Design a protein with these regions (language model features):
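Residue-identity detector for glutamine
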Residues: 23, 30, 34, 41, ...
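Structured C-terminal cap/extension of enzyme domains
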Residues: 277-279, 307
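Bacterial Sec-dependent N-terminal signal peptides
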Residues: 1-50
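Solenoid-like repeat scaffolds
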Residues: 268-269
Length: 311
């Protein structure tokens, strides 16, 4: 009888402890494949060479829009370091990771830049004038002041942000400003990031949808990124800008398995070459692939533009 009572008590105690243990265990991500230093050196050399680039807009490293605080990644699709190695440029939608605000994303960014040669771009906004900022000791508000001085001050603030956060350039999202304002801003950036500026290795990029940026910006722009979303019928064609500076981006938000990106990767102008191709919402292609490989479409597009050399 005593033995039966003892077994019953132990059983009930075990069940009680099991019931209390409701905290789910943290899932360990499968480790990424590690490569030799020779591989990474070859990767950095490739990205430093003249080739058609892959440019992506990536947001899943950060909390969802409107949320704040730290995000605990649930998969490599939510990690910067999980992006394909051969991507050249990553536009950081949703802000800029810092050691204080997003420690995992920040460390991923630093490691990816140093080890893989990937460059990271600040998303500047030329779609509206709701910008309040301070630069050179003076506060500006573009919603009420759109003078040449204020527009050029915004460009300096953008450049200052890029430098202070250790990023590699700025992308002006041209979807609302008039052409003269964009021209002033890009010309001002050239004074800082251009060949005669203090930071000549920083990039100046303009992405656009329906209205083409003024050709007056051509001497100062490293890349024009055309929002060539296939569901809206957009296609290739530099719209008056140099072909070698034009990058065509599909939207994986609408076409997560690739859409027109393979055609953009294969297309070439009659003479010379295009700047490259890429995708908005590249994270949507992490799971949605036709071949079962994470980011399968973007990997295939890179191979179409720049086939791997046979050993």
């Amino acid at each position: 009888m005593k033995t039966t009572k003892y077994i019953t008590i132990v059983t009930l105690l075990a069940l009680a402890l099991a019931a209390c243990d409701t905290q789910p265990e943290a899932l360990d991500l499968q480790p990424l494949k590690q490569y030799s230093e020779a591989y990474y050196q070859a990767l950095r050399d490739y990205k430093a060479s003249e080739h058609e680039i892959c440019y992506v807009y990536y947001a899943d490293w950060a909390p969802i829009e409107g949320a704040s605080g730290y995000k605990d990644p649930a998969s490599w699709g939510e990690r910067i370091i999980g992006l394909p190695d051969s991507i050249d440029l990553v536009n950081l939608w949703m802000g800029i990771p810092t050691p204080e605000t997003h420690p995992v994303a920040y460390q991923d960014m630093i490691e990816t830049r140093e080890k893989k040669g990937t460059r990271f771009i600040f998303h500047a906004d030329a779609s509206n004038y709701n910008h309040r900022f301070t630069i050179d000791g003076r506060a500006y508000d573009l919603s009420s002041d759109r003078s040449e001085e204020a527009i050029r001050a915004y460009a300096r603030w953008v450049c200052d942000t890029v430098v202070k956060t250790g990023l590699d350039g700025a992308d002006f999202d041209y979807e609302g400003w008039n052409g003269q304002h964009l021209t002033w801003a890009i010309e001002e950036c050239d004074k800082i990031f251009g060949p005669n500026g203090r930071y000549p290795d920083k990039l100046v990029i303009v992405d656009y949808f329906s209205v083409s940026p003024p050709v007056a910006c051509d001497p100062w722009v490293d890349y024009y990124v055309k929002q060539a979303y296939s569901q809206q019928g957009a296609g290739v064609g530099a719209m008056g800008h140099p072909d070698e500076k034009t990058v065509y981006c599909e939207s994986f938000g609408q076409k997560p398995t690739g859409g027109e990106i393979f055609n953009y990767a294969a297309w070439e102008p009659a003479t010379g070459h295009k700047g490259g191709c890429g995708a908005y919402y590249v994270e949507r292609n992490y799971y949605n692939t036709s071949d079962g490989v994470p980011y399968g479409a973007i990997r295939r597009a890179i191979q179409i533009m720049n086939p791997a050399k046979k050993q």
